[in-house]
Structure formats: C-alpha cells, structure tokens
C-alpha cells in the first residue's frame, strides 16, 4: 500500500484531481456514517442513480441547454472500445493507452505529396483526435497503473485494421499526444498489445465550440453568467492544428532502465585514530551497490548479467521487456565476490560488489613516488632515496616489502637515428653552446632540472644524438632532443680522417654538458651541423679553440749552473743569483762589489738599517725592455731565469721612456699559478736596468701581496742614471678596522655623520696647538724618527728594491716613505679607527 501511495503521489501531476484534504474529525464522521445501515442504503441508491444511462442522458441534455444559452455548442464524446497499448512511464509505472473511436471526432483526410528526401510521391495524412484526462486504475494483480484515452474517428480505426503502416502512424500519434500533454516519457521499445478492447470504465469527454449563428436570446446575458467561466475568444473557435513532423523520431531497439550507484561504507574505529595511515581508505568505499529498475521483468531468468572489474552489462531480449545497460564503475571491484538479488515485488535488481583496496605497502609506495616527484623540481638538493623519519614505526621497525621475482626484461631493440625519436612525443631543441680543446668538443645544453635517468645518447662515426626530459612544477614532462653532425670531408681543409670515438653526457642543476672525444691525432673542426634531428640541420662555427698548456719547466733539459752568492751584514742577509758569467756581467759585478765595500753615506746607512730583498724577476723584465731584440740576441746562449712575477709599467712619466713606446706600470701583478716571490731574492745585474725606480711593496708578515707606489722620479735610461731606490714597502697597523652599522639607519647616513664628526675633531686639535706646541711636536717627531732606525724587537722590514742613479747632472725627488711608530700611530688615529701614512720628502744627492 505504501508503494502504491508513493507512486500515486509521484504521478499526481498526470491528472488535475486535487488531493483530498480530510481532517481526522471528518474521517471519523464518514466512518460512523458508513457504519449505519440507513446511510449505506441511501448512498448505494445515489450511486445507482448516477450510473443509470437514462439519468446520464437527462444530465447531458441539461448541460447542453445550459451551455447553448451562453452561446457555446458542446458535444459529449463517448469513447467506443478499439484496442489497448501497454507501456511504462519513465520505466517505473505501468501505463495503458486506450485507442477508442467516436463519430463526434472529425474524419482523417489525406493529400498527395512528395517525400523531400527520396523524391517519391505519397499521401500526407491529417488525423484528428480527442483526449481524456488520465486516471488511476489497477491492473490484474491489483497494482497501481495509469490509464489514458485517445479517441479517433471510427474510419481511422477501420483503416488501421487494413493497413499496418497506418496503424503504426495511429499508435505513434497517440503516444506523442500523451507525452506532449502530460510531459512524461513512454517506453516505446517495449510496447505490448494485450487482448483488451478497453481498460477500465469509459468516461465521456466534452468538445466545446462557439455557436456559429446564436439567437438573440442566446446573445442576451444570462443572469447566471457570472457563475460560469468567461467565454473563449472567437480566435479559439478553430481546432488546434499541430505541426507535422518531417522526420519521425528513431525508435530504440532496447530501452535503458533506470539505475543508481550507491557507495557502502563500514564504521571502522581505526580510521578515527591519529595514525598517518588511518585515513588512507576514507575516500574508498567498502562496496558498491547498483540498483536497476526492471518493471517489465518477472525474474532474472529473462535477462543476462555480466560483471567485470570496471563495468556492469545487462541485456534482456524478451519481447516486451527489452533492456540493455552498460555501466562503468567508479572503482575497481572484485567481480568474483559480488552477489545479485532481484525483488519480484518492486521489480528491482540489486547488485553488491566489494571494492578492491590497495594494501598499505602499495599506498606508501604511491605516496613515496609522489613525494619523490615533488622534490625533484623543488630546487633543493636531496637524496632521492631518503625517506621521511615520520613514516617509521614507533619502535623503529619498518616492515620489509617482499621482493617480487620478475624475469629479466628482454633487451630493447637497437636504436638507429631514424627510430631514436618517438613519433608520439613532441621534442624541443634546447639552447646550446660549443667549445673545442685539442681533440675534444664540449656542448653546453641550457636546460635546468634534467632527470639524469632520462638522458639517452646515440653515437655514430660522424654524428651524435641525445634526448632527455624535465619535469616541471605541474608534473608534466617536457622532452628535448639535440643532434650534432661533423661536417663532410670536403669541408675539412686541415684534417680529413677524424671521427667520434666516445661521448659523455652529464646532467647538472642548470644545464647538461655533453663531451665528444675525437681521435688521438685529430683536431676539433672549425664548424659543425646541429639541429633537432637529421633533417633541417644548420651550420654553426666553433669560436672557442683552445690548446692544452704544457709546463716548460718540467722539460728534461739540464739547467746551466748559476752563480749564487750569500752576503751577511749586521742587519740583513743578501742572496745574489747570477746566470753564467760573461765578459760584460763580470765587469758589472766588480763595480757592484766596489760599491758594496765603499763606505756608504749617512742617508744610505740610515736606509741600510732596514732589511731589503731584491726582486730578480723585476730586473730581468726591465733588462728585456731595455735591451730589446739586440739584447736578446746577445744573451741567446745564456739560459733565462724563469719569470716569477708579472708587472705592468706606469704611463704617467713619459720623459723617462723617451721615444720608444714602452709602458711603465706602478702595479705589480702575480700569476695565480706561478710561484710567489721570496723575501730574500736578489736582483742580478742591477746596474743594467734602464728604467726609473719601481716602488713595489711586499709585506713580509702577510701572504697577500699589495702594491703601494709613492712616485716614480724621472731618470736617464743610461746605466749610470739608474736609481738605487727601487723600494717596495708596505706597513700595516696593528689595529683592526671595525665598522658597525645600526639597523635603524642607512649606511650613507652613518658615513656622512662619521665624516662630519672626524672633521670636527681635526679642527679642534688644530685650534688647541699653539706655536710653541708645534715646535715641541716637531722635536717629538724627530725623536721618534731616530728611535725608528734603532734595532728593536718590533722592527719593520723592507722587502723592496732600492735602485739609485749615479748621474751628477740629474736630480730626482724621491718620496721615501717613513712611518710613525705604533704608539704614535695609535695615539693619532685611535679615535678614527683608520690607517694613516705620513710621507716625508727627502732629496738624495749622489
């Protein structure tokens, strides 16, 4: 009863009857009245009177006369039995359509027409009809069903019995009328024709039309007109003509039944814990329940059901109950562990299929794979095999996954240049650069985050192919390919027999480096062909040609013996290294010995108190610049001392150079890979130097070499005019400079503020000094200079060259550098935290 009531409520829109609104008191009053014998007798008499045909005729005549007084002609249509069509509404509710006849309906008529598709001639039929309202009824098993009446002219039914095509057109017209009027979907694939002339009790219907020639009495307003609805307008007097269908709707051979998929879950308390794997299966149901509505089937013996891991297929070929359904499941199910049950009362098939869930190990492997892919593109260098310690068990034990014994895969087919790139993959040509070194070529492919395991190379004698892939932030791979081919033999002018011996490809963070090694006796080509593949290559030039450097000092040629002299003095140790003696150098050495034994002057003794070392390479380089090509020819037999320093010469004093374009520099540069100069190296042939004094400073207490040059006096380029004061000196204060920047101020603001404060202090010191104080300051300064020359434990060393000229006609103003003592220097600059140098000018006369 509940099922029938639910279906009746669902299809209440199929009729215009309103639901009875009865209260409980009214229902009790009706029940009490029916319980009385007198009331039941009166009620049955009323029913018999209403159903009496004679009384029905009197009722119809009175209604006709009443409508005629309003100017409306009405006709009562009494359906006569014809045949019945059985189908279903929306695949759920059983439905009967009575095809009846009545002479009150117009006759069908036809016209000769032409088929627009085939061009053949035929008849175009116009079939009038009348419909009654749908009503509820019961079938033979007392189940709820729906009944509709469609009334045609008796001639239409007569033609349907003689012509099958006309009968089919008549049935289609009736079905279209029901679907259009009541907005329902009828099952046309499962039409049945029961052996019935009419379903239920025939009920007449009324056809209303405006009177063609109303009488004056009929035109007068009736006193009861306000009780009836308004007259229809004159435009509605004509019957409604429906548009003719140019193409009939295709009738499906099988009907698609209604179905529903339900996901079934079990309450598992382990899913409500705080474990990491507690909610792995929250979104995966325990089973799937598929319900299929089959109202025309009596049992499952009349249909076929096939279930796979991902789909359900149902087929019923029974006449009047043709169903076909192919359903894809949202989850993988176990087709062997499912079950099906058919409810004969509801005509419903229920299929229960358990869902296949992945194991915990498979879930963890999947999450590890996703984590690996996400970390490969994060830009942070991590080990790919590292696992998060959070995923370990509390006891530190991780279950070992059983290793699957798999057979070794067969060897892949050999790659060829034509099959190296896949047709289904889109490749891009990366940006590249090429460098050559002897018999090797290096290609730099500018592609970042390349997967090392995706690099595949293919080598031939004269070509190389490489392909690789990268994975971006969206886990979408991007494929790259590069093809390089050596030029043909005709293009090579200097070497023709070189070929590629081996290749190496390595992936870095921002690029891929591919190295090509040619034959041992081969040379890198000047050009090459490159592109995405062998077709459409472009020629590129090799601009970076390099040659491997060979160490000439490691040659096995014996070095000639050198003259090494060591002289000890009170303040320093002088080591002199000379090449093999010649007639010229012997005389120069004698003069140097005489100058050394000669009593030095007062100023020279003051300078000699400082320890000096002479740079061998500086003198050799100056000799090379002075002698020129002639000097090099004369000393061809003399072995050259390996150059240990590189210097540039200043261009500021042009008078010392003369007409020759020789550069002089005040900066000294050292080779990054050559040996550092020692502090005791002496300069051979000092008098042969033809340039002015070099002031190249080297700190003996530091491994770093700095350059400080005071000034280069102008000297004659002759041997007599060579200066002896080529000093190289630098001094560093013991104080460490420290600069503190506050976070709430800018650097430029602090710099200006400190400079202003320093200037104010200097002006204040100058104002405090009187004339007498200035004299005391000079005496104190002279005393400090004398103490500086005395030997002490904290002695400053000089590591430069001191070259002076012997010419009496030229005077040079050499700016010799003198420094304050550490105590004086600290007193003068303790507040400024800076290093200051004081330069004293002295004139040297020889």
Curated annotation (Swiss-Prot):
Annotated keywords: Cytoplasm, Phosphoprotein
Pfam families xrefs: PIH1, PIH1_CS
Domain of life the protein comes from: Eukaryota
Ranges of Basic and acidic residues composition bias in the record: 821-832
Residue numbers spanned by region Disordered: 1-21, 377-412, 581-657, 743-846
GO cellular component annotations of the record: cytoplasm
Biased composition range(s): Basic residues: 596-612, 750-766
Record field: compositional bias (Low complexity): 399-408
Cytoplasm is among the record's keywords: yes
Gene Ontology biological process: axonemal dynein complex assembly; cilium-dependent cell motility
Location in the cell: Cytoplasm
UniProt xrefs under InterPro entries: Kintoun (IPR034727), PIH1/Kintoun_subfamily (IPR050734), PIH1_N (IPR012981), PIH1D1/2/3_CS-like (IPR041442)
Residue positions, PTM Phosphoserine: 378, 770
UniProt cross-references to PANTHER family, sorted A to Z: PIH1 DOMAIN-CONTAINING PROTEIN 1, PROTEIN KINTOUN
Quaternary assembly: Interacts with Pp1alpha-96A, Pp1-87B, Pp1-13C and flw.
Family: Belongs to the PIH1 family. Kintoun subfamily.
Function, as annotated: Required for cytoplasmic pre-assembly of axonemal dyneins, thereby playing a central role in motility in cilia and flagella. Involved in pre-assembly of dynein arm complexes in the cytoplasm before intraflagellar transport loads them for the ciliary compartment.
Protein name per UniProt: Protein kintoun
Species per Swiss-Prot/TrEMBL record: Drosophila pseudoobscura pseudoobscura (Fruit fly)
Primary gene name: Nop17l
């Amino acid at each position: 009863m509940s099922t029938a009531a639910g279906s009746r409520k669902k299809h209440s829109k199929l009729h215009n009857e309103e639901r009875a609104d009865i209260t409980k008191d009214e229902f009790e009053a009706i029940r009490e009245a029916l319980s009385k014998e007198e009331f039941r007798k009166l009620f049955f008499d009323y029913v018999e009177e209403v159903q009496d045909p004679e009384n029905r005729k009197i009722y119809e005549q009175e209604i006709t006369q009443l409508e005629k007084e309003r100017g409306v002609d009405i006709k009562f249509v009494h359906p006569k039995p014809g045949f019945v069509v059985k189908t279903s509404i929306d695949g759920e509710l059983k439905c009967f359509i009575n095809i009846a006849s009545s002479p009150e309906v117009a006759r069908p008529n036809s016209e000769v027409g032409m088929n627009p598709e085939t061009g053949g001639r035929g008849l175009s039929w116009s079939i009038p009809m009348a419909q009654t309202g749908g009503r509820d009824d019961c079938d033979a098993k007392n189940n709820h069903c729906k009944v509709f009446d469609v009334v045609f002219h008796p001639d239409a039914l007569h033609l349907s019995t003689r012509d099958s095509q006309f009968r089919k057109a008549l049935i289609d017209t009736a079905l279209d009328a029901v679907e259009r009027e009541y907005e329902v979907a009828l099952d046309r694939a499962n039409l049945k024709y029961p052996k019935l002339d009419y379903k239920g009790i025939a009920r007449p219907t009324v056809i209303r039309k405006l009177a063609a020639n109303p009488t004056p009495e009929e035109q007068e307003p009736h006193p009861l007109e306000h009780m009836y609805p308004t007259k229809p307008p004159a435009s509605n007097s004509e019957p409604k003509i429906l548009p003719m269908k140019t193409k009939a709707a295709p009738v499906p051979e099988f009907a698609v039944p209604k179905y529903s998929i339900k996901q079934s879950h079990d309450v598992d308390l382990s899913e409500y814990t705080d474990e990491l794997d507690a909610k792995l299966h929250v979104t995966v149901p325990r089973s799937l329940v598929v319900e299929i509505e089959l109202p025309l089937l009596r049992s499952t013996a009349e249909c076929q059901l096939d279930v796979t891991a991902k789909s359900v297929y149902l087929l019923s070929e029974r006449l009047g109950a043709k169903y076909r359904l192919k359903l894809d499941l949202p989850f993988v199910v176990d087709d062997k562990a499912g079950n099906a049950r058919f409810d004969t009362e509801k005509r419903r098939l229920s299929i229960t299929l358990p869902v296949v869930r992945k194991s915990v190990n498979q879930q963890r492997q999947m999450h590890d794979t996703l984590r690996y892919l996400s970390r490969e593109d994060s830009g942070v260098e991590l080990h790919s095999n590292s696992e998060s310690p959070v995923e370990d068990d509390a006891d530190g034990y991780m279950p070992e996954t059983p290793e699957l014994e798999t057979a070794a895969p067969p060897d892949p087919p050999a790659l060829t240049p034509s099959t190296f790139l896949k047709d289904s993959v889109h490749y891009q040509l990366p940006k590249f650069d090429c460098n050559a070194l002897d018999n090797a070529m290096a290609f730099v492919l500018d592609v970042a985050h390349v997967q090392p395991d995706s690099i595949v190379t293919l080598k031939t004698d004269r070509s190389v192919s490489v392909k690789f892939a990268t994975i971006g932030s969206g886990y979408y791979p991007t494929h790259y390919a590069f093809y390089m081919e050596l030029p043909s033999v005709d293009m090579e002018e200097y070497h023709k027999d070189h070929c590629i011996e081996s290749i190496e490809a390595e992936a870095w963070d921002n690029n891929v480096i591919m190295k090509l090694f040619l034959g041992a006796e081969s040379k890198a080509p000047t050009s090459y062909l490159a592109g995405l593949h062998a077709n459409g290559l472009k020629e590129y030039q090799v601009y970076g040609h390099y040659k491997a450097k060979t160490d000439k000092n490691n040659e096995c040629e014996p070095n000639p013996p050198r003259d090494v002299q060591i002289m000890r003095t009170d303040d320093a140790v002088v080591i002199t290294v000379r090449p093999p003696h010649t007639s010229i150098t012997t005389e120069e050495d004698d003069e140097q010995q005489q100058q050394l034994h000669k009593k030095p002057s007062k100023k020279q003794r003051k300078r000699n108190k400082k320890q000096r070392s002479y740079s061998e390479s500086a003198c050799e380089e100056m000799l090379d610049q002075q002698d020129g090509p002639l000097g090099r020819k004369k000393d061809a037999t003399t072995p050259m001392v390996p150059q240990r320093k590189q210097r540039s010469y200043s261009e500021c004093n042009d008078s010392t150079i003369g007409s020759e374009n020789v550069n002089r520099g005040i900066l000294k540069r050292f080779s990054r890979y050559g040996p550092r100069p020692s502090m005791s190296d002496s300069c051979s042939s000092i008098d042969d130097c033809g340039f002015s004094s070099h002031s190249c400073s080297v700190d003996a207490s530091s491994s770093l070499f700095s350059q400080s040059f005071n000034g280069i006096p102008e000297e004659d380029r002759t041997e007599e005019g060579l200066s002896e004061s080529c000093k190289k000196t630098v001094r560093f204060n013991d104080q460490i400079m420290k600069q503190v920047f506050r976070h709430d101020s800018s650097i430029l603001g602090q710099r200006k503020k400190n400079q202003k404060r320093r200037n104010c202090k200097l002006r204040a010191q100058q104002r405090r000094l009187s004339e007498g104080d200035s004299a005391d300051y000079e005496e104190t300064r002279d005393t400090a200079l004398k103490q500086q020359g005395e030997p002490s434990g904290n002695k400053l060393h000089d590591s430069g060259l001191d070259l002076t000229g012997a010419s009496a006609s030229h005077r040079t103003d050499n700016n010799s550098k003198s420094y304050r003592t550490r105590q004086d220097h600290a007193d003068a600059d303790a507040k400024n935290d800076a290093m200051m140098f004081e330069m004293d000018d002295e004139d040297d006369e020889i």
